[in-house]
Amino acid sequence: MDFFKIQTLLGNFSFSILFIIMLFFFIESNFKWISKFHSLAFFGIILANILLTLLLLFRWIEENHFPLSNLYESLIFLSWSFTTIHIILEKITNSKIIGVVISPISLFTLAFGNFSLPPEMQKASSLVPALQSNWLMMHVTIMMLSYAALITGSLFAFCFLIITHFENKKAPQDFGYINDVTSLETSTSFNIVLDKKSINLINPLKNFDKSETKPEVFGALPLLTSPSAMSGNASPQRGDQLPLLTSPSAMYGNANDYSKIKTNLDNLSYRTLGLGFPLLTIGILSGAVWANEAWGSYWSWDPKETWAFITWLIYAIYLHTRITKGWQGTKPALIASIGFIVVWICYLGVNLLSKGLHSYGWVQSITNNL
């Protein structure tokens, strides 16, 4: 039985499924009618997870040890971890935004392992004596699970910042068109003719045609209006007042869409990072114990150890600000976004570029061959 061909086939099938699912989630985020097929996409995530599980099992059978001894195996396990987190979070929260965030990182991680690494790095190899320990499964598995949780939580935070940025960038245009409004007298209400058909979705004050309006629509329109009028229930045909200093989405009942998405992302980020941090702590401690058994020292400030400690500090600061200071929203999201970069440096950057006990030496070997 050619285990390598089977593993390659399983990896390629998993990639194809994840690619199709990622496209589905992106389309679903823009066209709500396709949501009726969401259960099929969720089944696809489960199928990809099963295929990756089989890939790891075949690898385990071939090597006679847990398949986390090189970069390729760790990438496969990381992609499996992303799909597992996706399944768990969507089952718990039933939030459809999870697929939009997690499916790309699952796909790209698997693609890097399948298509970017040279074939010799994808083939199974025997363990060096220092790695022939039960600590391999304990330490490396927990560290990879912590990476997956921390990266996922940081991605939620990064998406929160993106939505906040575009919301704030859009605000000067949507909220009031200040240049158009400042000439109006703000101390009193003023009378204008308002018809719903005349509201331009891009600019509420543009293309205002009085000839198409009806006399009964005349009324006082204040610059600022009550929250009830901003809820989207106001109707000019009933003589209700529509707000001037608000966005078109608010006029038609979608004012809270961004707010709900941001709240959802903030909560998902907090809870996922709250899971990843203790896993990282346990992984670092187990690694220290294993290092003492293998090399006689708990801590040697190896580049991997140093960056793992930096990663731990970043997320410790994040949780401290959330729990102790009560921070929410942009500030902790910025910290988590920094953590996203630091985690990837700790996982890939150090392993590929540096020399140390945790180095894979791929880049160094390529450089030496040039």
Provide a role label for each language-model segment.
Residues 126-133:
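Alpha-helical transmembrane segments and their interfaces in multipass membrane proteins
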Residues 174-176, 252-260:
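Cytosolic, membrane-interface loops and tails of multi-pass inner-membrane proteins
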Residues 129, 260-267:
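Short amphipathic alpha-helical coupling elements at transmembrane boundaries
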Residues 4-124, 138-165, 175-219, 244, ...:
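Hydrophobic cores of alpha-helical transmembrane segments in multi-pass integral membrane proteins
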Residues 296-298:
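Short, charged amphipathic alpha-helical segments flanked by flexible coils
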